[in-house]
Regions:
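Feature for intrinsically disordered/low-complexity regulatory segments and propeptides
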Residues: 1-73
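Intrinsic disorder/low-complexity polar-acidic segments
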Residues: 64, 68-167
């Protein structure tokens, strides 16, 4: 998806066994615990971003949800003219990835104030939080507006566990 490339979010996350060096300098690898690792990737300007551990101590029950899968979630809404992609961003070094679409469900208050509605999907590459799909009248563009949107009473709200495949 083009929005992922432009926002430098066209990377994947993978589970890799936790590794460490023991007291005698030998490399060790866990069979039970994993790290969630953002793959090395190349930005549009040619800069190579090295692999980065986003979270650690996860079990094999955790199923990472890729950024591309989140973008595909919005395709039906966009293809049917119900929404347009508005924002794609990451917070905390890619630990939270947020995609925002502006919906056609806008309205006007008495006095002429226009209220626009957005639908966003936030995936947490932290190993702890669920994917959140929510509607909001707050346009999410940074951590402050993201936090404000989480405090709203959402008309549409869903949670997706990382224990299941998001297909």
């Amino acid at each position: 998806e083009q929005i992922l490339r432009v926002a430098d979010l066209d990377w994947n996350v993978n589970m890799k066994p936790v590794q460490w060096t023991n007291a005698v300098g030998e490399s060790q690898e866990s069979e039970k615990y994993f790290s969630l690792v953002r793959e090395s990737h190349t930005r549009q300007d040619g800069t190579i971003v090295p692999e980065q551990i986003l979270s650690s101590g996860l079990t094999d029950q955790y199923k990472p949800i890729q950024n591309m899968r989140m973008a595909k979630f919005f395709n039906e809404y966009i293809d049917n003219g119900v929404a347009t992609m508005e924002t794609a961003m990451s917070l905390f070094g890619g630990r939270i990835v947020i995609l925002v679409a502006k919906t056609n469900e806008n309205f006007e208050l008495a006095g002429g104030d226009k209220i626009e509605q957005y639908l966003y999907c936030a995936s947490y590459h932290t190993g702890r939080d669920q994917v959140k799909v929510r509607s909001s009248s707050t346009r999410v563009v940074c951590n402050n507006t993201f936090s404000a949107s989480l405090r709203e009473n959402a008309a549409v709200q869903g949670l997706i566990s990382h224990r299941y495949d998001f297909t």
